[in-house]
A protein has these predicted regions:
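Short solvent-exposed beta->alpha transition segments
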Residues: 28-29, 33, 43-90
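Exposed beta-sheet edge and beta->alpha loop/turn motif
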Residues: 85-133
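Sec-dependent N-terminal signal peptides
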Residues: 4-15
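Short, low-complexity N-terminal intrinsically disordered segments enriched in polar/charged residues
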Residues: 14-40
Length: 133
């Protein structure tokens, strides 16, 4: 009986790790696809990765694109993207991302993620640290 409990515990642990890994990959994939869309000024496609609440705030991809160009130029024109830790903050999944922009300035951003019926979406982005050099 003790061996069965240990086996079930190990099985549960590994299935949780695998699920978390899959979420990590899916979340990073969404962020990567949005950043790739920004690189070619495809704001329509980039807007598809935004959560319903973000879509409601901006209304359309044109307004969303203006906000990104003005407020997040390092996301609009990136040079290097490195994924850091996926954290749970106040019940929300937050993917930390280190971005090097085209001027070789380094930024740490927090991508707040939400799971919807259509998959993972980006609910918001905050700049954790201004340029690191």
């Amino acid at each position: 009986m003790k061996n069965l409990i240990v086996f079930i515990s190990i099985l549960f642990f590994y299935s949780t790790v695998i699920a978390e890994t899959n979420d990590d990959q899916k979340i990073q994939g969404v962020i990567s696809q949005q950043i790739s869309s920004f690189q070619v000024d495809d704001f329509d496609k980039a807007f598809t990765f935004a959560s319903p609440s973000i879509k409601k705030i901006f209304g359309n991809s044109n307004n969303f694109g203006k906000m990104v160009r003005r407020g997040f130029p390092m996301v609009w024109r990136t040079k290097v993207v490195d994924y850091l830790k996926l954290l749970i903050v106040d019940g929300a999944l937050v993917q930390r991302v280190m971005i090097t922009d085209i001027n070789d300035e380094i930024f740490i951003l927090n991508y707040i993620m939400v799971e919807t019926t259509k998959g993972w979406k980006i609910r918001g982005v905050t700049i954790d640290q201004r340029p690191l050099t």
